[in-house]
UniProtKB/Swiss-Prot annotation:
NCBIfam families: yidC_nterm (TIGR03593), yidC_oxa1_cterm (TIGR03592). PANTHER family: CYTOCHROME C OXIDASE ASSEMBLY PROTEIN COX18, MITOCHONDRIAL, OXA1. GO terms for cellular component: plasma membrane. Interacts with the Sec translocase complex via SecD. Specifically interacts with transmembrane segments of nascent integral membrane proteins during membrane integration. GO terms for biological process: protein insertion into membrane; protein transport. It is found in: Cell inner membrane. Required for the insertion and/or proper folding and/or complex formation of integral membrane proteins into the membrane. Involved in integration of membrane proteins that insert both dependently and independently of the Sec translocase complex, as well as at least some lipoproteins. Aids folding of multispanning membrane proteins. Belongs to the OXA1/ALB3/YidC family. Type 1 subfamily. This is Membrane protein insertase YidC. CDD domains: 5TM_YidC_Alb3, EcYidC-like_peri. It comes from Chlorobium chlorochromatii (strain CaD3). The keyword Aminoacyl-tRNA synthetase does not apply. The chain crosses the membrane at residues 6-26, 363-383, 428-448, 474-494, 514-534. Keywords: Cell inner membrane, Cell membrane, Chaperone, Membrane, Protein transport, Transmembrane, Transmembrane helix, Transport.
Length: 584
């Protein structure tokens, strides 16, 4: 979770809790627990790079002949993308998605402008030569330079590099007509005694192209990651002029890189030895360049090593990446694993997917979802609203007690407890629905901000529900507010004001008048930079809450109001004393 997200959500939580303090009697609020953070290992950019990124040597030893040649390009097109392969390195050089456009609604190359390709094998020979297959010229065994497939069709592009007698490298790409997954097949023949450390790396080298207008926000979502031993390993190149590295041993189920809405991941079909991640943020443009590598065994006794990988290069669609069956969905940021992620994975996304089965407009889906949440929480919110109304009716009684027993706190607390019990109210009852909804609200923030389902889906004046619904851009930024005016937050702030206006309060009018204005304004400031979908959800939820409050105010009668006895209950000692006096 990035720093700005934590700060924004924490401020919203604080505002809501402060508001609850003014809407209910003062209660002791436990301080929020500090979220434990761990620093990633940072290495100075001046340190020498590891073998994965060190500069190529002038000679290639056994591979010197293969370093000379001519490049042949092969284009494979399916229902979802157009991929360009190069015989130099037998690598993937370009991938243009068909069903997704960039922030300017133009087709884009997800692999960016890196000229030498992203996918390669890397190893160190025993005579000290660093070999990156992107420096070598392969032979295209398939010969065909262009192929289009669709549906259930499959097509394989094969490359071969003959290094010496009985020594060769074979690489094959297997494409499917309707899938983002590409099988990547590797054979190393006759190199068991030539490669140092009996290990080679399969690496994805290069960050994915930024596709959104807000590059700073996209950089906050860019990272390299791996799933190792059932745990997510993340590397974020958050600072310029520093190289960030992470290297771990063990069996990994995937490594990959991502930007805000897309990912490129390598999934081994056989056991890996470990992972290596590296990242660096480019100066001045927010772009973060990443490398993610799998370490694979190459036994000295083996005459041939054959490994197959699945390469997923495509959108961060939850159902699609989860279908890979290796925990690739963990690369998607849904906030805290123990709090907001369960809401996102088990509630929000399933309901959205179900509704999307027969409703194509996500704005309508959000409205229906807000209604469903209100329906589920209706019994709780009804009980809490009635409790707050009763608390407001009790205020004159409570104030009288506070004056009467101001010098006897114990007696005052005893009488307050008695009155609450007789009136059938819970002093904290009004807080419960709001507190229960906060994890859901935070989870929706992450889903709306990072889920590709909402990307470039509009509703009313909002062109994209995953970003703020700006109706006017200033051209400069106002501190805390932003560089634009979003309209959903304005409407939402109006409903917050109206809801407070018609909700009975247990605090003095002077304090309530301040909060009546201050709370909507603060919510307006914070929601102005949040996804339009979140503003729409909160707007509709508040509208349903206002309707509920009008109904409660209209249907509540005098008989529903608490009736309490102001006379203090006599203690047991005083009762016995009275009985003893009567006998005399």
């Amino acid at each position: 979770m990035d720093k700005n997200s934590v700060t924004g959500l924490a401020l919203i939580a604080v505002i809501m809790l402060v508001w609850l303090q003014f809407m209910t009697p003062a209660q002791k609020v436990q301080p929020p627990q500090q979220v434990a953070t761990t620093e990633q290992q940072v290495a100075s950019a001046s340190l020498p790079l590891p073998a994965a990124l060190s500069p190529s040597t002038d000679t290639f030893g056994l591979f010197a002949t293969a370093s000379q040649g001519s490049e042949q390009v092969t284009v494979v097109e399916n229902d979802l993308f157009r991929a360009t392969l190069s015989s130099k390195g037998a690598t993937l050089k370009s991938l243009v998605l068909k069903k997704h456009l960039d922030g300017h609604l133009q087709p884009f190359d997800l692999l960016g402008k890196q000229k030498n390709g992203h996918l390669s094998l890397l190893f160190l020979t025993k005579d000290g030569k660093r070999i990156d297959t992107r420096d070598l010229y392969f032979r295209n065994v398939t010969l065909e330079t262009k192929r289009t497939i669709s549906g259930q069709e499959r097509y394989t592009v094969r490359y071969r590099l003959d290094v010496a007698p009985q020594k060769a490298i074979e690489i094959a790409y297997l494409f499917s007509g309707e899938s983002y997954a590409i099988d990547y097949d590797v054979k190393l023949i006759g190199f068991g005694n030539d490669i140092a450390g009996n290990e080679y790396q399969v690496q994805w080298d290069g960050g994915l192209a930024y596709t959104e207008k807000n590059r700073e926000e996209e950089s906050q979502n860019a990272l390299a990651g791996a799933y190792l031993g059932g745990s997510l390993v993340k590397l974020d190149a958050a600072k310029e002029k520093e190289v960030f590295r992470e290297e771990q041993s063990g069996e990994a189920t995937w490594v990959g890189v991502r930007n805000k809405y897309f990912t490129a991941a390598l999934i081994p079909q056989s056991k890996s030895n470990g992972i290596y991640l590296e990242g660096k943020r480019e100066a001045g443009n927010h772009f973060e360049n990443y490398l993610a590598a799998l370490k694979m065994s190459l036994p000295a006794s083996a005459t041939e090593v054959h490994n197959t990988f699945t390469m997923y290069v495509g959108p961060l669609d939850y159902n699609t990446v989860k279908a890979q069956g290796v925990g690739l969905e963990k690369i998607m940021d849904f906030g805290w694993d123990w709090l907001t992620r369960p809401f996102a994975e088990w509630m929000i996304l399933p309901v959205f997917n179900w509704l999307n089965g027969f409703i194509s407009n996500y704005g309508i889906i959000i409205i229906i979802f807000a209604f469903l949440v209100k329906l589920v929480t209706y019994p709780l919110s009804m009980a809490s609203t009635k409790s707050m109304k009763k608390m407001a009716a009790l205020q004159p009684v409570l104030q009288e007690l506070q004056v009467k027993y101001k010098d006897n706190p114990a007696k005052m607390q005893s009488e307050l407890s008695r009155i609450y019990r007789e009136a059938g109210v819970n002093p904290v009852g009004g807080c419960l629905p709001t507190l229960l909804q906060m994890p859901l609200l935070f989870a929706m923030f992450y889903v709306f901000r990072s889920s590709i389902q909402l990307r470039q889906h509009g509703f009313l004046w909002a062109k994209d529900l995953s970003v703020p619904d700006s109706i006017f851009d200033f051209g400069f930024a106002i501190p805390l507010y932003g560089d634009h005016i979003a309209f959903f937050p304005i409407l939402m702030a109006g409903t917050v004001y109206l809801q407070q206006k018609i909700t009975p309060t247990a605090q003095p009018n002077e304090q309530m008048k301040i909060m009546l204005v201050l709370f909507p304004v603060m919510m307006l400031f914070f929601f102005n930079n949040m996804p339009a979908g979140l503003g729409l959800y909160y707007l509709m939820f508040n509208i349903f809450s206002v309707a509920q409050q009008f109904y409660i105010n209209k249907t509540t009668t005098a008989d529903d109001m608490p009736k309490v006895n102001l006379a203090p209950v006599a203690s047991n000692a005083s009762k016995k004393q009275k009985k003893g006096g009567a006998k005399k």
